[in-house]
């Protein structure tokens, strides 16, 4: 049985330092996976800095449990928040706070045999100060159970 794994992932994508100067400094993630960070899909890699510590365990044969906690901050305070694929969903409007929010993610996978497997993924987004200060804000929960049959 595999040993437990502890990991960390970090992402940095540029934001626009000076709005209205005729130059766009915001990273453009062409063809990005909407759920690149979590099922919550509240942001995309444009003007985002994030850190994701994670932990994976294999308690029994065929069962994998993966957990992560992600911290999201705007890279540049003068730029807003973007959602997939790259829509500006919240303008900066002079707000200096950078904390967008945190996401707790959980994935439980169980492979019964080489043909049948089950997967349960969930994520819980906790709104940060920028979300709260820039408009409507609420925490969001997503869950996606799946069963796969390969032949």
Residue ranges and their predicted role:
Residues 18-26, 78-84, 130-137:
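Outer-membrane beta-barrel translocator domains and adjoining extracellular loop/strand segments
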Residues 3-6, 62-65, 110, 114-120:
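Repeated loop/turn-to-beta-strand initiation elements of outer-membrane beta-barrel proteins
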Residues 2, 47-51, 100-104, 137-143:
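Residues that define the transmembrane beta-barrel architecture of outer-membrane proteins
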Residues 113-146, 150:
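Predominantly the C-terminal beta-signal and adjacent terminal strand-loop region
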Residues 1, 8, 53-57, 106-110, ...:
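Residues on the lipid-exposed face of transmembrane beta-strands in outer-membrane beta-barrel proteins
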Residues 78-105:
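Outer membrane beta-barrel transmembrane domains
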Residues 8-12, 67-71, 120-124:
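Transmembrane beta-barrel strands of outer-membrane/channel proteins
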Residues 38-41, 90-94, 129-135:
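Extracellular loop and loop/strand-boundary signature of outer-membrane beta-barrel proteins
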């Amino acid at each position: 049985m595999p040993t437990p794994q502890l990991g960390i992932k970090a992402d940095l994508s540029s934001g626009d330092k000076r709005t209205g100067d005729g130059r766009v400094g915001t990273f453009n993630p062409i063809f990005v996976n909407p759920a690149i960070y979590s099922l919550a899909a509240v942001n995309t890699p444009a003007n985002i800095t994030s850190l994701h510590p994670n932990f994976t365990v294999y308690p029994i044969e065929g069962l994998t449990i993966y957990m992560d906690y992600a911290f999201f901050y705007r890279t540049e305070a003068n730029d807003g928040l973007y959602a997939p694929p790259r829509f500006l969903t919240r303008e900066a409007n002079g707000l200096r706070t950078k904390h967008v929010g945190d996401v707790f993610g959980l994935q439980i996978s169980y492979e019964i045999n080489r043909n049948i497997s089950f997967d349960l993924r969930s994520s819980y987004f906790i709104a940060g100060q920028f979300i709260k200060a820039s408009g409507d804000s609420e925490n969001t929960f997503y869950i996606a159970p799946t069963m796969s049959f390969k032949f």
